[in-house]
Amino acid sequence: MKLKSVIAAFALAGLGAGMTAALPASAAAAAPALQQVAKFGHQVTGVTVSETGRIFVNFPRWTEDAPVSVAEVMKDGSIKPYPDAGWNAWRNASGDEISPADHFVCVQSVVADGHGSVWVLDPAAPATQALVPGGPKLVRIDLATNKVAKVYAFDQSVAIPGSYLNDVRFSSDGKFAFMTDSGQRGALVVLELASGKAKRVLDGHSSTQIEKGVQVHTDGKELHYPDGRKVQFSADSIALAPDGWLYWKPLTGHKLYRIQASALESKGFAGQDVAGDVQPFGEVGISDGFWIGDKATKGNGNLLYVTSPETNAVSVRDLSQGPSGALRTVVQDARLRWPDTFGQGPDGTIYVTTSHIQDSAFFKKDAPPSLPTQLWKFKPAE
């Protein structure tokens, strides 16, 4: 709906058909310790950490009418609606009585920009189905005042019917935002923050669509809906490297793609075709969240961290090795049931949510609407 040398742990075994395995590192290496930060009574997806260490999470309205959409995680692990209860007051049952323009409808992602703001991406599509008219938006909250500072609303030329705006990254100069649309027709969305104008790019391009022939597996078997439909999510994972390369891929797919952000800002935003600027960049298997560290957070801008839900793992790829670079396991743990989204603290600690998607009522008929989920952390090796 985001490090220096990396230590790998367990070799991957017993992978389902069609899955891309991460390579084990040296047997002498030890996995970083995985620690639980908080547990939730509802399905979490996004997490982000501000430059001062404040932690924020979000809860989409997928299988239940979540009582809180965006929250700050307090030091004792409890949560507090953020920025206030008012913005979190939307309920599906009373949606015709509350304005979707200034309430969180179905939040998929939260991202702190490192410059005093946290951004909330709201595709406004409960259960990933029909859009709530007037609901799709990107919201900037000022961390100093804890007040909403700006709302960027998206009309149907951007949030088209069937869309699901998934995750967002920001250009280094703070002038543009780049979003993935994992809905029925995948795309990237480029938003110029000064003007508020947004443009769909690579709309329907192969790099943003589900990859034919790819199936998502969990617990050693194919994951599908009770009616037999396969898991099909378009452009989802996204990360922006310090050198200006924007990386993304469909969730239902193995292939990684990249483009220079400058091409999106100039040609793409102007409506020009940027398909020729897209570069295939190897594979990373089925993934959900991406994170590229930077020097400010004791990271390495060449390392792409990847959540690997098929194997209950966090993996990494050294982008400096080019398209043939291998995916390696950082930490693999049975508790990482559908590792979803990354955040990184100012001390370099990496946070990751587990959204338990395979355990949800989407895929299990007898699953309760409310799904217990968790937030974890680990410290990558120096």
Which residues does each PLM region occupy?
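Beta-rich, blade/repeat-based domains predominating
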Residues: F40-T52, D96-S117, L121, V158-A177, ...
